[in-house]
């Protein structure tokens, strides 16, 4: 005997359908499009780099503006007028046999010649600094290029500018690692991994030394005026040292443009309360509580010196930063705190003896 049919059961919620993954349509690039393809530039600037880093970039990187062109044009016109007037005075003095005026014209010509030579030298140094920015852009393009033939000549030019001899072990390892089948990206990458770290290590040592000197000088110095003068002098020397390591010679005008940033740095060294408050972001609360006011001020000034050196190093390098080879402020912070601890311990132990 058959069983009776069960009544229908109605559910309040509808049945859930299993989600099906939707695939995107395949995208293919032709050979012509692949040649013109360029990866999008990604801003790798850390979040902590703000107004201070922009000020360093503005101070170190040469600019071109309409105001500057107008001033240079006015100076050129004034110089041409002075030369023309000098020639006229010389001719009049020669015709009238006024030897005193003729001697004055000769002295003026020597002074003008020296001034023109200084201007030409300064322009050449600014042009060299501007060329370094172009070389860095060219290196960035080569690091994303698959062409062949430009990488080796470019790297050899960088080594020559930096004063690296052909017999240098790092350069010899680079020559041994490259071969004809490698493209420009691989050759420049090998140079960045084998040769460029030699100069970067020297620049790091200079930054560490100058930052430590700034820290210790402020800790032991009782006069704020001496602190400010010392910070200004050491910061300018640090910029010059880093530029020399990378084969760049800074001129008088470049130093004037850096002076604004140095003033910001020495003002920080002279404001102990501000340094102590900002220093909480760089070191822990317990360590800041154990350190004295002068020690906290010294660490703050040393960190600013290190930050200035890092930015100068970045703008003087012929190659962009690759992976994580950019020096970090935290590395110098740990070194400064360690050196300061040793100095304070030695100063405490010496009176006991």
From Swiss-Prot:
Pfam family for this entry, one: DUF697
Entry GO terms, CC: plasma membrane
Regions crossing the membrane: 70-90, 100-120, 213-233
Regions of compositional bias (Basic and acidic residues) in chain numbering: 1-19
Membrane topology: Multi-pass membrane protein
Region (Disordered): 1-35
Chief site of localization: membrane
Keyword set, alphabetical order: Cell inner membrane, Cell membrane, Membrane, Transmembrane, Transmembrane helix
Presence of the UniProt keyword Magnesium in the record: no
InterPro entries membership: DUF697, UPF0283
Domain of life: Bacteria
Protein name from the UniProt record: UPF0283 membrane protein YcjF
Organism: Salmonella newport (strain SL254)
Gene: ycjF
């Amino acid at each position: 005997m058959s069983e009776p049919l069960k009544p229908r059961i109605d559910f309040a919620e509808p049945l859930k359908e299993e989600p099906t993954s939707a695939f995107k349509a395949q995208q293919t690039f032709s050979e012509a499009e692949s040649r013109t393809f360029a990866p999008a530039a990604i801003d790798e600037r850390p979040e902590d780099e703000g107004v201070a880093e922009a000020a360093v970039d503005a101070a170190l990187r040469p600019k071109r503006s309409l105001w500057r062109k107008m001033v240079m044009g006015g100076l050129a016109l004034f110089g041409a007028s002075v030369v023309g007037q000098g020639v006229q005075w010389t001719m009049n003095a020669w015709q009238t046999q006024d030897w005193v005026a003729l001697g004055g014209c000769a002295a003026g010509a020597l002074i003008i010649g020296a001034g023109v030579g200084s201007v030409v030298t300064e322009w050449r140094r600014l042009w060299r600094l501007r060329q370094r920015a172009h070389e860095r852009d060219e290196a960035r393009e080569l690091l994303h290029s698959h062409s062949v033939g430009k990488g080796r000549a470019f790297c050899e030019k960088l080594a020559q500018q930096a004063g690296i001899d052909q017999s240098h072990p790092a350069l010899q390892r680079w020559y041994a690692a490259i071969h004809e089948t490698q493209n420009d990206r691989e050759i420049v990458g090998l140079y960045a991994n084998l040769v460029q770290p030699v100069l970067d290590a020297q620049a790091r040592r200079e930054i560490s030394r100058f930052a430590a000197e700034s820290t210790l000088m402020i800790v032991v110095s009782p006069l704020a005026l001496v602190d400010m003068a010392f910070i200004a002098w050491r910061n300018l020397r640090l910029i010059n040292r880093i530029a020399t390591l990378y084969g760049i010679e800074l001129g008088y005008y470049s130093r004037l443009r850096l002076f604004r940033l140095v003033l910001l740095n020495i003002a920080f060294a002279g404001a102990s309360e501000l340094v102590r408050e900002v220093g909480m972001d760089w070191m822990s609360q317990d360590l800041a509580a154990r350190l004295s006011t002068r020690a906290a001020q010294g660490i703050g000034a040393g960190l600013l010196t290190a930050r200035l050196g890092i930015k100068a190093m970045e703008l003087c390098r012929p190659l962009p930063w690759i992976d994580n080879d950019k020096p970090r402020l935290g590395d110098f912070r740990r070194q400064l705190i360690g050196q300061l601890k040793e100095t304070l311990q030695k100063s405490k132990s010496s009176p006991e003896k």
